[in-house]
């Protein structure tokens, strides 16, 4: 007799791969925060996993894409928007999208700026004040300290409403867009 089984239903719960550990930390922290406070009855239906960056050349990017297929049948990656302007095709995010398009079976790429053109990187979801305090550089120690403070502080004012609303907007967009993707 089996006392407990764990099943993963990708139609109800998706894995979203993110570029790095700080992105993972911020997104996972807000997911836990919202699930405990606002979405207890309808938790956010995805888990974030970091992929250690987009890599530096097309071959390495394509190796990463192949590895993602080993982890998930329908990989979804949330990437920054590294373009300096709309015409910047040399940005790493654009190179990654091109490398993906060259694959026989491309993965799904979600770009932050498609949610809101102000969101070029995860840190842009923070208000100016919160960014200065918690996300001024991509430092994992700062991100971990933020996680501890947000999740374990009894205070509800660790971050401002603008920051909460921005992350909520991002999560709602991810839920909406992933519901359009067939598993």
Question: Regions from the language model: what does each represent?
Answer:
Residues 1-183:
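Acidic, divalent-metal-binding catalytic cores of TOPRIM
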């Amino acid at each position: 007799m089996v006392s407990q089984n764990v099943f993963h239903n990708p139609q109800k719960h998706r894995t979203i791969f993110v570029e790095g550990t700080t992105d993972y930390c911020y997104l996972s922290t807000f997911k836990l925060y919202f699930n405990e406070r606002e979405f207890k009855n309808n938790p956010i239906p995805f888990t974030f996993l970091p992929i250690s960056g987009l890599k530096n050349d097309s071959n390495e990017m394509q190796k990463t894409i192949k590895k993602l297929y080993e982890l998930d049948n329908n990989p979804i990656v949330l990437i920054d928007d590294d373009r300096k302007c709309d015409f910047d095709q040399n940005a790493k995010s654009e190179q990654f999208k091109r490398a993906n398009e060259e694959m026989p079976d491309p993965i799904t790429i979600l770009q932050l700026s498609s949610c809101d053109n102000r969101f070029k990187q995860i840190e842009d979801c923070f208000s100016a004040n919160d960014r200065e305090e918690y996300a001024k550089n991509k430092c994992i120690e700062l991100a971990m300290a933020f996680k501890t403070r947000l999740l374990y502080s009894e205070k509800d004012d660790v971050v401002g409403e603008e920051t909460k609303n921005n992350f909520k907007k991002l999560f709602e967009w991810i839920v909406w867009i992933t519901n359009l993707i067939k598993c």
